[in-house]
Amino acid sequence: MNKEFEKRRRVLAKMIGKDGIAVIPTAKTRVRSRDTDYPYRPDSDFYYFTGFSEPDAVMILAPGREDGAFIVCLRAKNPVTEIWDGHMEGLNGVKKNFGVDQSFKIQDLETILTSLFLGRQKVFFTLGQDDVMDKALMKSFNDVRAGQRRGGVVPSEIQALEPLVHEMRLKSFFFLCVD
């Protein structure tokens, strides 16, 4: 595991604070022609924090969490898919090779988000890039807010993540160019 990715996550965690949570999905595969996909390229922001380059994955950063702040939801290993698309890390491989604290199946994303939103005041996410991801996040956000009457802290806002991430990436680029 590259320590640079870990350092970037620590910086982002400081920026969003212990009352915030960041959600960063990766890019989807793009169909080229019926059963042929374009070569896969992960979302730049997702890769900047994880170093992980499989499709159908979401990084969640929840600072101060007892079970670890770095969570990834991804596809489970599938031998048939690996024949066509190549090696898959799977739930255990992503923990071992990328320093993930906890990993879950991507199918459980809404449930995971709903539980992680409890006790947080702000959700950092970039809306408008993926309708399916937007709907999943908004459903979890609204489910948690609907249960607010039971007490406890729940998110009151969704803030754009891009300005924070791009400021970090700009500074990283600047320091690389100064050498």
Task: Please report, for each region that a protein language model flagged, where it lies by residue.
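A composition/biophysics-driven feature that prefers long, compositionally simple stretches
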Residues: 1-179
